[in-house]
């Protein structure tokens, strides 16, 4: 049986749970590197390694690329790069679960804008209340860099919204994972002038190299490839609904791997954000074939 046929049989929720465990497990591994390599440098290295893996796997030079295709893939890559760098800066200052929940304002906003009805509109209000609770607890904690973390996660949320919209446009043009490889390469090239120097410490220790490769595979290659597959099945609003499965995953990974235990008020904020995402109504999924799933 072809791998694409197997993936096509896996329900979207199951794909997202596996994707979330990998992505946030990779984030927890990345946090352990921040003492040696700045967070932005780790994020760029993650993108660089993921780009190399995807380019070797998908060999995008075999496709015919129009100027529009390249511009779209580059814009997608820039959004992806900003999202990753800002998120890593945020989790250097905020608990993983809190950062992930606040970042979900991006997908909730996409659902509200692209969907229709009271569910999508009310989701924004609930998400806003949840974010206020989470941000309030963070600011009252007097944790070093809390304000920096909140600003960074706001930037990440905005970039995530752009990623969803641009990712949909990339995916529907066909061979989404191959186009993702080009987007990753564009993100690595754009970030290189600013982040190469910050990433230099990794060159002196093979254990750091191995850790960065692990972060890239867990947090970029697997999750983003899965998301490209699922984006072929659902619209932006539906994608945002499926993402409602992930905040709890981030909290569990943060608690188990990083010993970041949320307070009661934070749990309420997390719950409100999850409900906000769940309230948004997905569009009717488009048919998916085995070839689409294996793209």
Predicted regions mapped to residue ranges:
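Hydrophobic transmembrane alpha-helices of multi-pass small-molecule transport proteins
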Residues: 54, 105, 119-138, 244, ...
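Transmembrane alpha-helical segments that form core, pore/gating elements
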Residues: 54, 110-111, 127, 133-134, ...
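Hydrophobic alpha-helical transmembrane segments of multi-pass membrane transport proteins
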Residues: 18-25, 29, 57, 74-89, ...
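Alpha-helical transmembrane segments of compact multi-pass small-molecule transporters, enriched
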Residues: 48-53, 102-113, 186-190, 238, ...
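Juxtamembrane helix-entry segments on the extracytoplasmic side of multipass membrane proteins
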Residues: 8-12, 36-44, 65-70, 137-159, ...
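Glycine-/small-residue-enriched transmembrane alpha-helix faces in small-molecule transporters
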Residues: 1-44, 78, 82-86, 129, ...
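Hydrophobic/aromatic residues within transmembrane alpha-helices
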Residues: 33, 42, 46, 90, ...
């Amino acid at each position: 049986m072809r791998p694409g046929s197997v993936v096509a049989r896996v329900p979207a929720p199951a794909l997202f749970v596996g994707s979330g465990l990998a992505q946030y497990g990779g984030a927890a591994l990345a946090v352990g590197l921040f003492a040696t390599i700045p967070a932005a440098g780790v994020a760029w290295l993650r993108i660089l390694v993921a780009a190399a893996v995807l380019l070797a796997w998908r060999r995008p030079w075999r496709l015919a690329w129009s100027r529009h295709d390249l511009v779209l893939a580059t814009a997608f890559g820039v959004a992806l790069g900003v999202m990753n760098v800002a998120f890593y800066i945020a989790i250097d200052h905020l608990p993983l679960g809190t950062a992930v929940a606040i970042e979900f304002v991006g997908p909730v906003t996409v659902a509200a804008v692209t969907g229709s009805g009271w569910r999508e509109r009310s989701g924004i209000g609930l998400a806003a209340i949840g974010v206020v609770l989470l941000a309030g607890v963070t600011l009252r904690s007097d944790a070093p860099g809390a304000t920096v973390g909140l600003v960074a996660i706001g930037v990440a949320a905005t970039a995530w919204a752009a990623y969803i919209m641009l990712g949909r446009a990339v995916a529907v043009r066909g061979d989404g994972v191959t186009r993702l490889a080009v987007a990753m390469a564009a993100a690595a090239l754009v970030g290189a002038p600013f982040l190469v120097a910050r990433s230099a410490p990794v060159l002196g220790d093979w254990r750091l190299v191995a850790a960065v490769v692990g972060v890239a595979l867990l947090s970029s290659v697997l999750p983003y490839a899965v998301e490209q597959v699922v984006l072929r099945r659902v619209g932006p609003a539906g994608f945002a609904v499926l993402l409602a499965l992930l905040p709890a995953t981030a909290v569990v990974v943060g608690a188990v791997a990083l010993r970041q235990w949320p307070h009661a008020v934070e749990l309420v904020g997390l719950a409100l954000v999850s409900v906000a995402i769940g309230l948004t109504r997905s569009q009717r999924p488009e048919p998916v074939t085995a070839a689409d799933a294996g793209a």
